[in-house]
């Protein structure tokens, strides 16, 4: 779903474990492209419903495996670089408008299954320190990642 300003409505997921680490996943066949799970909100879905759907589609977890600890107060935006905009596809998407969720893993991490869906998004995952993703995510997402982690840090370390 794309809003009137050309932003695709989306949810982002920060999944943390009991060691104050966050799940970091590599995009399928994109050796240097790592990110948090995220995905679009379908028409008729709430952000929370989209988050649970994406959680299952991308890392194979369901609502019983996690607990929502927090969500961002505001929607976060990032613009795509011009070379990544698909100019011939309508409506044109200029970037993402995201609601982020902080989740605590309740199950063992052996439940994480990045190949639970035939069209899987990721081919590897690992636990990383809290601030690691900000230095490693693709440049146009860094500001959003920084804001998200600043909003969630107190909850993660408590």
Curated annotation (Swiss-Prot):
Quote the Pfam families the UniProt record gives: NUDIX (PF00293)
Q: Where is the Nudix hydrolase domain?
A: 6-150
- E.C. no: 3.6.1.-
Q: What's an example GO BP annotation here?
A: mRNA catabolic process
Tell me which InterPro entries the record gives: Nudix_hydrolase, NUDIX_hydrolase-like_dom_sf, NUDIX_hydrolase_CS, NUDIX_hydrolase_dom, RppH
Quote the CDD domains the UniProt record gives.
Answer: NUDIX_Ap4A_hydrolase_plant_like
Q: Which GO terms of the molecular function aspect are on file? A: mRNA 5'-diphosphatase activity
Which enzyme type, at the first EC level? hydrolase
Look up the domain of life of the source.
Answer: Bacteria
* Keywords from the UniProt entry: Hydrolase
Residue ranges annotated as motif Nudix box: 39-60
- Report the SUPFAM superfamilies cross-referenced here: Nudix
A cellular component term (GO) from this record? cytoplasm
**From the record, what ranges are coiled-coil?**
none
Kindly list the cofactors needed. a divalent metal cation
What is this protein's function? Accelerates the degradation of transcripts by removing pyrophosphate from the 5'-end of triphosphorylated RNA, leading to a more labile monophosphorylated state that can stimulate subsequent ribonuclease cleavage.
Q: Which family does it belong to?
A: Belongs to the Nudix hydrolase family. RppH subfamily.
Please state what the protein is called. Answer: RNA pyrophosphohydrolase
The species this protein belongs to is Blochmanniella pennsylvanica (strain BPEN)
């Amino acid at each position: 779903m794309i809003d009137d300003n050309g932003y695709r409505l989306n949810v982002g997921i920060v999944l943390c474990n009991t060691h104050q680490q966050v799940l970091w996943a590599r995009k399928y066949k994109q050796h240097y492209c790592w990110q948090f799970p995220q995905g679009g909100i379908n028409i008729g879905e709430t952000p929370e419903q989209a988050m649970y759907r994406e959680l299952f589609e991308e890392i194979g977890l369901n609502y019983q495996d996690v607990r929502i600890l927090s969500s961002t107060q505001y929607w976060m935006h990032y613009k795509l670089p011009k070379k990544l905009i698909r100019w011939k596809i309508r409506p044109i998407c200029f970037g993402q408008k995201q609601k982020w969720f902080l989740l605590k893993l309740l199950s063992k991490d052996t439940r994480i299954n990045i190949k639970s869906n035939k069209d899987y998004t990721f081919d590897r995952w690992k636990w990383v320190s809290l601030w690691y993703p900000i230095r490693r995510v693709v440049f146009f997402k860094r500001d959003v990642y920084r804001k998200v982690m600043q909003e969630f840090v107190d909850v993660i370390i408590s």
